[in-house]
A protein has these predicted regions:
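Amphipathic alpha-helical blocks and their helix-capping loop/short-beta junctions
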Residues: 127-157
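N-terminal leader/linker segments that precede catalytic domains of diphosphate-processing enzymes
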Residues: 1-61, 66-120, 130, 151-152, ...
Length: 198
């Protein structure tokens, strides 16, 4: 999938109404789903968190984090976090839109922003937070037939998604947000998934 095809499909559908779940003591956070075109194919930018972090160590994630008091709004939070984690300057980011707010078990409600960056964009990792940055062809993670789902009845949400890619396993909130992006871009394929349990 190239840049033009993605933008056409993404813009076909209206932006989601932002509705936060009525849950107490949830903190605002954001992620930036960054897309970059390489050899006429869009890739999604992912990071592997440092194994020394206190929370979610070693997991695959998007750049992002919690909103701070001095942030003007959630988009400002997303741009600040991307700058801190991977050295991405705010002026190098083109925001395309956003997805539904995504609640996670750590008492955060996460707003995913979708954005484009240029192919030659350099990165500078904060080694304390990010062990590695890599890209995955967007088509690989948007095809719902590659998504696995595990159903858990006692969680805030009852489905945990897994998206294997080569030797990596994208799972949890990161996979869930990619699933939402896939459903937004390909609504006709929403019911396709591979269950891990009955």
């Amino acid at each position: 999938m190239n840049r033009d095809e993605f933008l056409r499909r993404f813009m076909l559908h209206p932006a989601p109404r932002i509705q936060r779940p009525k849950l107490h003591r949830m903190h605002a956070a954001v992620v930036l789903i960054l897309l970059v075109e390489r050899e006429q194919e869009l890739h999604v930018v992912l990071t592997q968190r440092s194994k020394y972090l206190r929370h979610h160590a070693g997991q695959i994630s998007f750049p992002g984090g919690r909103q701070e008091q001095h942030d003007a709004n959630l988009l400002a939070t997303a741009l600040r976090e991307a700058h801190e984690e991977i050295g991405l300057a705010p002026e190098d980011v083109t925001i395309v839109g956003q997805l539904h707010d995504y609640p996670v078990l750590s008492n955060f409600i996460v707003r995913p922003f979708v954005a484009l960056i240029e192919p030659q964009q350099p990165f500078k990792l904060d080694q304390h937070e990010v062990a590695e940055i890599f890209t995955v062809p967007l088509a690989q993670v948007l095809y719902q037939n590659r998504h696995y789902v595990y159903r858990l009845r006692r969680l805030l949400y009852d489905q945990v998604y897994f998206i294997p890619y080569q030797q990596r396993n994208i799972w949890g909130a990161t996979a869930g947000m990619l699933r939402e992006l896939a459903d937004h871009v390909y609504p006709e394929r929403q019911r396709i998934y591979r269950p891990l349990n009955d």
